Amino acid sequence: MRRPWRVAVVGGGIAGLAAAVRLRDSAPAGTEITVYEQSGVLGGKLRTGELAGQPVEFGAESFLMRDPTGAESAAVALARRLGLAEKIVHPTVGQAALVIDGGLRPIPGGTLVGVPGDLERVATVARPAADADTDGGRPLVGPDADISVGELVRSRFGDEVVERLVDPMLGGVYAGRADDLSLVTTMPALARTARVEHTLVGAVRAAQAAAPRAPGAPVFGTLAGGLSTLVEAAVTASGATIRRDAAVRELTATDTGWRLTVGPTRDPELVDVDAVVLAVPARPAARLLSGPAPAVAAGVGALDYASVALVTMALPQPRLPELSGFLVPSTEGLLIKAATFFTTKWGHLGRPDGLALVRASVGRYGEEAHLQRPDADLAATVHRELSAVLGTPLPAPVDGHVQRWGGALPQYAPGHADRLGAARTALRAAHPTLVLAGAGFDGVGIPVCVRSGETAAEEIITALGGSAR
């Protein structure tokens, strides 16, 4: 292929933008990259807004500094590539709490997403089942099996550990329940060790040992000035043509690549390209795949999503505990499932006037009806519940914002990784220049999405480099 490549990236979230940057870095000079975003805003779930005159995250708040192997995460590497490494800041308060019986108790250490590696350390919040985690003479999970996190943990530690520890931890990330979420997709490190170890305590410890972290090394980071700076820098570095408010409605295979149908039904724009990175959620991806790859579309489109709302308040001089925030088990009967004390957790957000920024997350999978309330009602309920948990009336907010994220968080059922692997294998065989990327396929979190986009870009480069066209 001698002429400049033309590559379309459908979806302007961080996965799509990471793909565009990698294409610019690694594809031949002159490659034409166009990013199509159906909304008017780039960055997907990365969105920095302003509250009481201060930048605040209305979407994703931070990223992991390390990947599961202990190496630098893809988010950190991207920030470094974009010249933002010096802007990375870390939490100044790391201790979080759980709401247990209406009060706050510190989250015990030594767990892996709430799954304990030391049963004595979690006794302050949950009572593990006595003598259930015994060596049965074989690995916990079969070599090719995938089960729910809840099934594994309940069988070894009992209900209370799941309901008070694991469920709220997973709920804070996925807005889902441990009994419904895939072990392989949501906790891959534990899944690997569970295929070798005979006890769950042993599997947790082995997973922790496989990704050692230096004492005191930060787990999370964010960018001073907000995560939208990552989005803006990626757009600039990609050198891509950015098409906002440009919905791609159809993909059609051609003799030389792909034809995109873009824009309104009555007057569509037809665009011919050599390759496509499809970096949109599973259901929109399935709609676009329904023509060229209907069997793949059927598998991809089965993924369900949870909706959430983030309620952020600016509170004048509230009495807050010295915590980064707290998680709420569903058994507590509260609307909120998590809260973050932004100005306590992140020292760079602290204000001399004592104004505090507090954000609460609302919404669990299957409970979308709770999100039908008007913004004012949602904010009032959050304010009331925060006051009750903290044991003191909070002052009235001087500013606030409700950000609703409909269908935001994928619910990876057991077997997701195998289903996705089969779909990708079929798609690669039939259409190597059409590649999937994003949270709906590879997992949530900024590093995973960045890596997903970069991997998709590399697949496109390989496919076009080997093309005879």
Residue ranges and their predicted role:
Residues R2-A15:
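Beta1/beta-strand and adjacent pyrophosphate-binding region of the FAD-binding site
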Residues A52-L140:
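Dinucleotide-binding Rossmann-like beta1-alpha1 core, especially the glycine-rich loop
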Residues T134-L251, G257:
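Active-site/ligand-binding neighborhood in enzyme catalytic cores
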Residues A246-R359, G363-Q372, A376, A388-V389:
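Mid-domain catalytic core of redox enzymes
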